[in-house]
Amino acid sequence: MHSLFSDGELLPSEIARRAQVLDHETIAITDHVDSSNLEAISKIIEAIDDINNNWDINVVPGAEITHAPAEVIDKLAKKSRKLGAEIILVHGETLAEPVVEGTNLAAVKSSNVDILAHPGLITLEEVEIAKNNNVSLEISARKGHCLANGHVASIATDIGVDLIINTDTHSPNDLITFKQAQKIGLGAGLTKDKAMEALVENPKKILEKCGFTY
Protein backbone atom coordinates (compact mmCIF):
# COMPACT_ATOMS: atom_id res chain seq x y z
CA MET A 1 0.00 0.00 0.00
CA HIS A 2 1.23 3.48 -0.85
CA SER A 3 0.69 6.66 1.15
CA LEU A 4 0.93 10.29 0.11
CA PHE A 5 4.64 10.09 0.88
CA SER A 6 4.98 8.58 -2.60
CA ASP A 7 2.12 8.36 -5.12
CA GLY A 8 -0.73 7.35 -2.84
CA GLU A 9 -3.62 9.60 -1.85
CA LEU A 10 -3.92 8.93 1.88
CA LEU A 11 -2.02 9.42 5.11
CA PRO A 12 -0.83 6.22 6.81
CA SER A 13 -3.51 6.60 9.50
CA GLU A 14 -6.34 6.78 6.97
CA ILE A 15 -4.98 3.79 5.07
CA ALA A 16 -4.94 1.81 8.30
CA ARG A 17 -8.41 2.93 9.34
CA ARG A 18 -9.97 2.06 6.00
CA ALA A 19 -8.24 -1.33 6.04
CA GLN A 20 -9.44 -1.95 9.58
CA VAL A 21 -13.04 -1.29 8.56
CA LEU A 22 -12.61 -3.99 5.88
CA ASP A 23 -11.44 -6.43 8.60
CA HIS A 24 -7.79 -6.55 7.59
CA GLU A 25 -5.57 -7.85 10.39
CA THR A 26 -2.19 -6.73 9.02
CA ILE A 27 -1.14 -4.37 6.24
CA ALA A 28 2.19 -3.05 4.99
CA ILE A 29 2.77 0.53 3.88
CA THR A 30 5.50 0.33 1.25
CA ASP A 31 5.97 3.64 -0.48
CA HIS A 32 7.87 3.85 -3.76
CA VAL A 33 11.53 4.71 -3.21
CA ASP A 34 14.80 5.21 -5.01
CA SER A 35 17.93 7.02 -3.81
CA SER A 36 16.13 10.37 -3.86
CA ASN A 37 13.48 9.75 -1.20
CA LEU A 38 14.55 7.01 1.19
CA GLU A 39 13.66 9.38 4.04
CA ALA A 40 10.01 8.58 3.28
CA ILE A 41 10.53 5.38 5.27
CA SER A 42 11.39 7.17 8.50
CA LYS A 43 8.55 9.66 7.99
CA ILE A 44 5.87 6.98 8.28
CA ILE A 45 7.32 5.02 11.19
CA GLU A 46 6.12 7.31 14.00
CA ALA A 47 2.59 7.29 12.57
CA ILE A 48 2.73 3.51 12.27
CA ASP A 49 3.81 3.23 15.91
CA ASP A 50 0.80 5.36 16.91
CA ILE A 51 -1.50 3.08 14.93
CA ASN A 52 -0.06 -0.16 16.25
CA ASN A 53 -0.19 1.07 19.85
CA ASN A 54 -3.80 2.18 19.71
CA TRP A 55 -5.79 0.31 17.06
CA ASP A 56 -6.67 -3.32 16.49
CA ILE A 57 -4.67 -3.62 13.27
CA ASN A 58 -1.00 -4.32 12.62
CA VAL A 59 0.83 -2.00 10.22
CA VAL A 60 4.27 -2.93 8.92
CA PRO A 61 6.62 -0.21 7.63
CA GLY A 62 8.27 -1.07 4.35
CA ALA A 63 9.49 0.19 1.00
CA GLU A 64 9.00 -0.63 -2.67
CA ILE A 65 12.15 0.03 -4.71
CA THR A 66 10.78 1.43 -7.95
CA HIS A 67 12.28 2.13 -11.39
CA ALA A 68 15.79 2.28 -9.95
CA PRO A 69 18.76 0.97 -11.96
CA ALA A 70 18.92 -2.78 -11.50
CA GLU A 71 22.54 -2.46 -10.39
CA VAL A 72 21.59 -0.55 -7.21
CA ILE A 73 18.57 -2.58 -6.08
CA ASP A 74 20.45 -4.60 -3.46
CA LYS A 75 22.14 -1.44 -2.13
CA LEU A 76 18.80 0.35 -1.83
CA ALA A 77 17.25 -2.66 -0.11
CA LYS A 78 20.02 -2.63 2.50
CA LYS A 79 19.65 1.11 3.07
CA SER A 80 15.87 0.80 3.35
CA ARG A 81 16.23 -1.89 5.99
CA LYS A 82 18.62 0.27 8.01
CA LEU A 83 16.12 3.14 7.89
CA GLY A 84 13.42 0.97 9.45
CA ALA A 85 11.69 -0.79 6.57
CA GLU A 86 10.72 -4.22 7.85
CA ILE A 87 9.55 -5.53 4.50
CA ILE A 88 11.21 -4.79 1.15
CA LEU A 89 9.51 -5.05 -2.23
CA VAL A 90 10.87 -4.40 -5.68
CA HIS A 91 8.65 -2.94 -8.42
CA GLY A 92 8.95 -5.71 -10.98
CA GLU A 93 8.86 -5.78 -14.78
CA THR A 94 5.10 -5.27 -15.07
CA LEU A 95 3.58 -5.25 -18.54
CA ALA A 96 1.99 -1.89 -17.71
CA GLU A 97 5.19 0.17 -17.38
CA PRO A 98 8.64 0.41 -19.03
CA VAL A 99 10.53 -1.07 -16.08
CA VAL A 100 14.18 -1.56 -16.98
CA GLU A 101 15.13 -5.08 -18.08
CA GLY A 102 17.11 -6.85 -15.40
CA THR A 103 15.01 -5.56 -12.51
CA ASN A 104 13.40 -8.94 -11.86
CA LEU A 105 16.74 -10.72 -11.90
CA ALA A 106 18.37 -8.20 -9.56
CA ALA A 107 15.44 -8.47 -7.16
CA VAL A 108 15.40 -12.24 -6.88
CA LYS A 109 19.18 -12.34 -6.47
CA SER A 110 19.07 -9.98 -3.48
CA SER A 111 18.98 -11.52 -0.03
CA ASN A 112 17.51 -8.24 1.20
CA VAL A 113 14.33 -8.41 -0.90
CA ASP A 114 11.18 -10.08 0.44
CA ILE A 115 8.70 -9.71 -2.44
CA LEU A 116 9.05 -9.12 -6.17
CA ALA A 117 5.89 -7.19 -7.02
CA HIS A 118 4.01 -7.62 -10.32
CA PRO A 119 6.94 -9.33 -12.12
CA GLY A 120 5.25 -9.51 -15.52
CA LEU A 121 6.60 -12.22 -17.81
CA ILE A 122 9.13 -13.46 -15.29
CA THR A 123 11.39 -16.21 -16.62
CA LEU A 124 11.86 -19.75 -15.39
CA GLU A 125 15.44 -18.94 -14.39
CA GLU A 126 14.31 -15.95 -12.33
CA VAL A 127 11.63 -17.98 -10.57
CA GLU A 128 14.13 -20.70 -9.68
CA ILE A 129 16.47 -18.07 -8.22
CA ALA A 130 13.55 -16.58 -6.29
CA LYS A 131 12.86 -19.98 -4.76
CA ASN A 132 16.50 -20.46 -3.76
CA ASN A 133 16.65 -16.99 -2.19
CA ASN A 134 13.23 -17.14 -0.51
CA VAL A 135 11.79 -14.21 -2.49
CA SER A 136 8.00 -14.31 -2.86
CA LEU A 137 6.17 -13.28 -6.05
CA GLU A 138 3.10 -11.09 -6.20
CA ILE A 139 -0.33 -11.63 -7.69
CA SER A 140 -1.64 -8.09 -8.16
CA ALA A 141 -5.15 -6.73 -7.85
CA ARG A 142 -4.14 -3.55 -9.67
CA LYS A 143 -5.26 -2.72 -13.20
CA GLY A 144 -2.40 -3.23 -15.65
CA HIS A 145 -0.14 -4.99 -13.18
CA CYS A 146 -2.64 -7.87 -13.12
CA LEU A 147 -2.16 -8.68 -16.83
CA ALA A 148 0.47 -11.34 -16.15
CA ASN A 149 -1.16 -12.81 -13.02
CA GLY A 150 -1.95 -16.10 -14.78
CA HIS A 151 1.63 -16.51 -15.97
CA VAL A 152 3.05 -15.66 -12.54
CA ALA A 153 0.67 -18.01 -10.74
CA SER A 154 1.38 -20.89 -13.11
CA ILE A 155 5.16 -20.69 -13.16
CA ALA A 156 5.44 -20.01 -9.42
CA THR A 157 3.20 -22.96 -8.59
CA ASP A 158 5.19 -25.25 -10.89
CA ILE A 159 8.51 -24.29 -9.28
CA GLY A 160 7.19 -24.01 -5.73
CA VAL A 161 7.70 -20.30 -5.05
CA ASP A 162 5.49 -18.60 -2.48
CA LEU A 163 2.87 -16.23 -3.86
CA ILE A 164 1.35 -13.16 -2.21
CA ILE A 165 -1.90 -11.48 -3.26
CA ASN A 166 -1.53 -7.69 -2.94
CA THR A 167 -3.77 -4.75 -3.74
CA ASP A 168 -1.10 -2.17 -4.65
CA THR A 169 -3.41 0.36 -3.02
CA HIS A 170 -2.99 4.01 -4.02
CA SER A 171 -6.50 5.31 -3.29
CA PRO A 172 -9.47 4.33 -1.10
CA ASN A 173 -11.18 2.43 -3.92
CA ASP A 174 -8.16 0.13 -4.29
CA LEU A 175 -8.73 -1.51 -0.92
CA ILE A 176 -10.52 -4.85 -1.15
CA THR A 177 -12.02 -7.43 1.16
CA PHE A 178 -10.61 -10.86 1.91
CA LYS A 179 -13.30 -12.44 -0.25
CA GLN A 180 -12.39 -10.21 -3.19
CA ALA A 181 -8.74 -11.11 -2.76
CA GLN A 182 -9.65 -14.80 -2.84
CA LYS A 183 -11.43 -14.26 -6.15
CA ILE A 184 -8.36 -12.56 -7.60
CA GLY A 185 -6.27 -15.58 -6.67
CA LEU A 186 -8.78 -17.95 -8.22
CA GLY A 187 -8.97 -15.76 -11.32
CA ALA A 188 -5.21 -16.08 -11.69
CA GLY A 189 -5.62 -19.85 -11.82
CA LEU A 190 -4.80 -20.75 -8.23
CA THR A 191 -6.67 -23.51 -6.47
CA LYS A 192 -8.68 -22.59 -3.38
CA ASP A 193 -5.94 -23.99 -1.16
CA LYS A 194 -3.19 -22.08 -2.99
CA ALA A 195 -5.22 -18.87 -2.86
CA MET A 196 -5.56 -19.28 0.90
CA GLU A 197 -1.82 -19.87 1.21
CA ALA A 198 -1.17 -16.65 -0.70
CA LEU A 199 -3.51 -14.71 1.58
CA VAL A 200 -2.75 -16.20 4.99
CA GLU A 201 0.18 -18.58 5.34
CA ASN A 202 2.69 -16.94 3.00
CA PRO A 203 2.25 -13.41 4.40
CA LYS A 204 2.78 -14.79 7.90
CA LYS A 205 6.00 -16.46 6.77
CA ILE A 206 7.28 -13.15 5.40
CA LEU A 207 6.40 -11.32 8.60
CA GLU A 208 8.17 -13.95 10.66
CA LYS A 209 11.25 -13.74 8.41
CA CYS A 210 11.29 -9.97 8.90
CA GLY A 211 11.06 -10.39 12.65
CA PHE A 212 7.65 -8.76 12.92
CA THR A 213 5.46 -9.97 15.77
CA TYR A 214 1.68 -9.98 15.37
Language-model regions: role of each:
Residues 2-8, 36, 71:
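Acidic/histidine-rich helix-loop elements
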Residues 15-27:
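Catalytic domains of carbohydrate-active enzymes, especially glycoside hydrolases
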Residues 2-4, 33-34, 66, 93, ...:
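Catalytic metal-binding/acid-base residues of hydrolase active sites
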Residues 38-139, 207-214:
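Extended substrate/RNA-proximal surfaces in nucleic-acid metabolism proteins
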Residues 28-41:
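Glycine-rich, proline-tolerant flexible connector loops at the mouths of alpha/beta enzymes
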Residues 1, 97, 105-214:
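Charged catalytic cores and adjacent phosphate/nucleic-acid-binding surfaces used
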Residues 1-6, 29-32, 119:
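Histidine-centered catalytic micro-motifs
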